[in-house]
Amino acid sequence: MASEKYYIYVLYCADNSFYCGFTNNVKRRFHTHQTYQGAKYTRVKKRHPLKLIYSEEFESKHDALSAEYYFKHQTRRQKEKFLLDHGVDLLKLRRN
């Protein structure tokens, strides 16, 4: 039996903020955020449109939740460095 995969994902919001979450299905979870049914943070209209800018797969729920916790407790500068180190073009995001 194949074990379930878990993911963290990062959304870039229209107000220039980041939202990090945890899921076992990134596509479905992103859709819930886009339709204002996700986390309270992403239900705010001024944060839309949202862009899915990063996701990472984990073998265990514990590892994914730990990574989400770690990301959420970083400073803005540390989050930006993490995203840049993982190939996210923040300058391009801000221009669009």
UniProtKB/Swiss-Prot annotation:
Pfam families: GIY-YIG. PROSITE patterns: GIY_YIG. Residues 4-81 form the GIY-YIG domain. InterPro entries: GIY-YIG_endonuc (IPR000305), GIY-YIG_endonuc_sf (IPR035901), UPF0213_domain (IPR050190). Gene3D superfamilies: GIY-YIG endonuclease. It comes from the Bacteria. Belongs to the UPF0213 family. This is UPF0213 protein Lreu_0682.
